[in-house]
């Protein structure tokens, strides 16, 4: 969330930032509501002061005037509460300001490829897509997934389930033992205020699964609960930076047009992901972003799968992000670069929404922390890349060397 004072004093900058994102935000309405709020607050202060003076008087005229004032004050308090509620809602719908280093672009087609790592495999045969390989090996069952839950669900069986478990264990081990992240296992159902703090609500409610009776929300990503671990807390500077990693299932409606990405396990209502999350001092956040990208890339390097790094343009960075990078793995069976990680610096956007602050000294005024998030990495697209890059002519799949200690086998046949 942007600071209201910042919007008031930098209105044109905010308008330009919103335009650069190729989106809209209720800036005019925010300014009108802010003006109304201040007018009502001033009138209330005046009437309350007058009521205190009149309360000391005992004549009938003063008593009558006091009664009238109480009624007017009650009306103004109700009106002010309604205005403040609307103002908060509109502020929650304004995206973060892109950093000056982010290229301006109208959509994802203008994202900038920064570099490629690894070489595409030179196949002596035509590589098959993962759905053909998975069904032939009986490690992915699409029909029974649909029978249980409908479209965009699937079942992993046998070595397929073990492969995913091996990937998750490998990623968690690398991030905790080598990169120094603290592992968290959060709830999959969280309160509404958690998703407001993370930036998913109110703007993206239509893409989330919700239990209306209990008002619980299924996590779209572990970023949401991790944002809230320190909600309404004041941290000491010695506690920063804080690095968390969490594995969760993720739940999204993923409303897609018919015919797009309908085959395979690329786009689903439920998928698994290892998430990286950081709290840090404002002056450190962009360095922490580069480190997070390197931590995520190390997974792709270890799996020996070709990948590329993209910097996202202003119109493609997420709602809460000030700067983002995407890591995309190459998958030869579908002949696509698949996004397996998006790493973002949200500056103080989530810190302000979640009210997470820190003090530089015990006597210092609290400041909002900066937060960062990134996939480290996202399944099942990593599964797709592993299956398709490591396939053999007979349809079997070689298990990447780093996964063999977790799998206990060298190949899936």
From Swiss-Prot:
InterPro entries: aa-tRNA-synt_IIb, aa-tRNA-synth_II, aa-tRNA-synth_II/BPL/LPL, Ser-tRNA-ligase_type_1, Ser-tRNA-synth_1_N, SerRS_1_N_sf, SerRS_core, tRNA-bd_arm. It is an enzyme of class 6 (ligase). Its EC number is 6.1.1.11. Pfam families: Seryl_tRNA_N, tRNA-synt_2b. One of its GO terms (cellular component) is cytoplasm. L-serine binds at residues 221-223, 275, 375. Pathway: Aminoacyl-tRNA biosynthesis; selenocysteinyl-tRNA(Sec) biosynthesis; L-seryl-tRNA(Sec) from L-serine and tRNA(Sec): step 1/1. Keywords: Aminoacyl-tRNA synthetase, ATP-binding, Cytoplasm, Ligase, Nucleotide-binding, Protein biosynthesis. SUPFAM superfamilies: Class II aaRS and biotin synthetases, tRNA-binding arm. One of its GO terms (biological process) is selenocysteine biosynthetic process. It catalyses: tRNA(Ser) + L-serine + ATP = L-seryl-tRNA(Ser) + AMP + diphosphate + H(+); tRNA(Sec) + L-serine + ATP = L-seryl-tRNA(Sec) + AMP + diphosphate + H(+). It is found in: Cytoplasm. GO terms for molecular function: ATP binding; serine-tRNA ligase activity. Gene3D superfamilies: Bira Bifunctional Protein, Domain 2 (3.30.930.10), Serine-tRNA synthetase, tRNA binding domain (1.10.287.40). ATP binds at residues 252-254, 339-342. The keyword 4Fe-4S does not apply. Consists of two distinct domains, a catalytic core and a N-terminal extension that is involved in tRNA binding. Catalyzes the attachment of serine to tRNA(Ser). Is also able to aminoacylate tRNA(Sec) with serine, to form the misacylated tRNA L-seryl-tRNA(Sec), which will be further converted into selenocysteinyl-tRNA(Sec). NCBIfam families: serS. Homodimer. The tRNA molecule binds across the dimer. This is Serine--tRNA ligase. It comes from Dehalococcoides mccartyi (strain ATCC BAA-2266 / KCTC 15142 / 195) (Dehalococcoides ethenogenes (strain 195)).
């Amino acid at each position: 969330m942007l600071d209201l004072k910042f919007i008031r004093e930098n209105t044109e900058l905010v308008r330009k930032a919103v335009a650069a994102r190729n989106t809209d935000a209720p800036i005019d309405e925010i300014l009108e509501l802010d003006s109304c709020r201040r007018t009502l607050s001033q009138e209330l202060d005046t009437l309350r002061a007058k009521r205190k003076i009149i309360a000391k008087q005992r004549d009938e005229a003063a008593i009558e005037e006091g009664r009238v004032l109480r009624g007017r004050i009650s009306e103004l308090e109700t009106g002010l509460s309604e205005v403040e509620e609307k103002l908060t809602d509109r502020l929650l719908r304004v995206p973060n300001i892109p950093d000056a280093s982010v290229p301006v672009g109208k959509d994802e087609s203008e994202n900038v490829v920064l570099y490629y790592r690894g070489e595409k495999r030179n196949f002596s045969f035509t590589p098959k897509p993962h759905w053909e390989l998975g069904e032939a090996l009986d490690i992915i069952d699409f029909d029974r997934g649909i029978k249980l839950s409908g479209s965009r669900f699937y079942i992993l069986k046998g070595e397929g389930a073990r492969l995913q478990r091996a990937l998750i264990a490998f990623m968690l081990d690398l991030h905790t033992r080598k990169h120094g992240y603290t592992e968290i296992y959060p709830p999959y159902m969280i309160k509404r205020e958690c998703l407001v703090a993370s930036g998913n609500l109110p703007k993206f409610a239509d893409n989330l699964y919700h239990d209306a009776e209990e008002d619980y929300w299924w996590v779209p990503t572990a970023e949401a609960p991790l944002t809230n671990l320190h909600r309404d807390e004041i941290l000491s500077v010695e506690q920063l930076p804080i690095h968390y990693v969490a594995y969760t299932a993720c739940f999204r409606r993923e409303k897609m047009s018919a015919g797009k990405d309908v085959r395979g396990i690329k786009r689903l209502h439920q998928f698994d992901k290892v998430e990286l999350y950081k709290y840090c001092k404002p002056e450190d956040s962009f360095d922490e972003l580069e480190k997070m990208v390197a931590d995520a890339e190390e997974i792709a390097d270890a799996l020996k799968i070709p990948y590329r790094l993209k910097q996202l343009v202003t119109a493609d960075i997420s709602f809460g992000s000030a700067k983002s990078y995407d890591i995309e793995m190459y998958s030869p069976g579908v002949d696509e670069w698949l996004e397996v990680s998006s790493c973002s610096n949200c500056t103080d956007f989530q810190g302000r929404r979640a009210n997470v602050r820190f003090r530089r000294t015990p006597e210092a005024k609290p400041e909002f922390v900066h937060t960062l998030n990134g996939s480290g990495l996202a399944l099942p697209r990593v599964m797709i890349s592993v299956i398709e890059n490591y396939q053999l002519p007979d349809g079997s799949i070689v298990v990447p060397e780093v996964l063999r200690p977790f799998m206990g086998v060298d190949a899936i046949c």
